């Protein structure tokens, strides 16, 4: 009897106390929720805000959110079926990029330094595949060329540079299995744009450029963009110099909100493209040993070519 009475008393105590705590807790939380529900107010004031990002236009931040390279449509990057990297105009300016291959210096899966400091050709090795046969597209059109006849687009005239990794023959036809490069040029803008730049630096660097744009009428039906640049610099190697003169006029016609026609042009003259070569490890990284046992290294401005070994290039699009 005593054992049974003790058991019953203990059971009541251990059961009733937690139940009371649960009831009080539920009551308090319900009251707090009701109070919060009564006082929580969310309001939004409509405004102009930032212009919606387009896969063919400038990105509002360093990191782009949309791309057309993986689908050929204006698609969010996270919904692209393949790996896509986008280097925006803002990022190129932050890093002072002077070549397309330089834009991808920090892009995973890409080797850009296998030609040293030479920017004569935008040699890219994507996922280990050939650096000289990487397909490049500009505004959706393929840049035909190979080896010394390849295009070298100045990044100052680009809005974004995109890299699509992996086989893409379904979208782009015959292409390098490593991937393709897609370039988007600067487009006419309805907003007034006035930019002039000057740059001077080592190796007799001198560069000047301008970027103008805006609407040609009050309704914004017609707009333009005029971008130009002149650049000259001595190469590290003797007997070499880089000279480049580029201009890109563009015109846009927007008869309504759903129709836009762009006329994009690009003219570039390079009387001298600079140094295109490389030196062996022996004599640069490690010294060369003479017959008498002494050692030496090649000078930093050594050029293994001849005075006549120069490349000039003219680009018209």
Which stretches of residues belong to each language-model region?
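Acidic/polar loop-and-plug regions of large Gram-negative outer-membrane beta-barrel proteins
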Residues: 231-235, 247-254, 258-317
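Short, glycine-/polar-rich solvent-exposed loops and beta-turns at beta-strand/coil boundaries
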Residues: 98, 104-120, 149, 154, ...
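Transmembrane beta-barrel architecture of outer-membrane proteins
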Residues: 87, 95, 121, 145, ...
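Short acidic/polar hinge/loop motifs at secondary-structure boundaries
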Residues: 123, 141-165, 183-185
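Transmembrane beta-barrel outer-membrane domains
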Residues: 117, 151, 201-205, 240-244, ...
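Outer-membrane beta-barrel translocator/receptor signature
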Residues: 156-159, 170-247, 253-260
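Cleavable N-terminal targeting peptides that direct proteins into the secretory/outer-membrane pathway or into
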Residues: 1-38
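Extracytoplasmic beta-strand/coil segments of soluble accessory domains associated
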Residues: 62-84, 89, 101, 105-141, ...
């Amino acid at each position: 009897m005593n054992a049974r009475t003790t058991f019953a008393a203990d059971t009541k105590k251990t059961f009733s106390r937690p139940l009371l705590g649960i009831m009080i807790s539920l009551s308090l939380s319900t009251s707090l929720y009701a109070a919060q529900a009564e006082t929580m107010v969310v309001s939004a004031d409509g405004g102009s805000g930032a212009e919606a990002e387009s896969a063919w236009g400038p990105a509002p931040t360093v990191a782009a959110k949309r791309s057309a390279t993986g689908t050929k449509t204006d698609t969010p990057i996270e919904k692209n079926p393949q790996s896509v990297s986008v280097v925006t105009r803002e990022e190129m300016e932050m890093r002072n990029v002077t070549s397309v291959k330089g834009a991808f210096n920090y892009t995973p899966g890409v080797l850009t330094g296998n030609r040293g400091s030479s920017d004569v050709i935008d040699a890219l090795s994507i996922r280990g595949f050939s650096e000289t046969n990487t397909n490049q597209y500009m505004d959706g059109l393929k840049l035909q060329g190979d080896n010394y006849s390849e295009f070298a687009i100045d990044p100052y005239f680009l809005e974004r540079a995109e890299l699509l990794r992996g086989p893409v023959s379904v979208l782009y036809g015959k292409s390098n299995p490593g991937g393709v490069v897609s370039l988007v040029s600067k487009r006419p803008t309805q907003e007034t744009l006035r930019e002039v730049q000057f740059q001077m630096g080592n190796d007799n660097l001198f560069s000047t450029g301008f970027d103008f744009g805006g609407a040609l009428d009050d309704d914004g039906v017609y707009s333009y963009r005029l971008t130009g640049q002149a650049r000259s610099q001595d190469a590290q190697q003797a007997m070499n110099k880089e000279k480049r003169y580029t201009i890109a006029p563009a015109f846009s016609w927007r008869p309504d909100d759903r129709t836009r026609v762009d006329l994009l042009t690009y003219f570039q003259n390079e009387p001298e493209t600079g140094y295109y070569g490389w030196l062996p490890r022996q004599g640069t990284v490690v010294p060369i040993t003479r017959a008498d046992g002494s050692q030496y290294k090649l000078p930093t401005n050594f050029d293994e070519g001849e005075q006549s070994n120069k490349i000039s290039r003219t680009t018209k699009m």
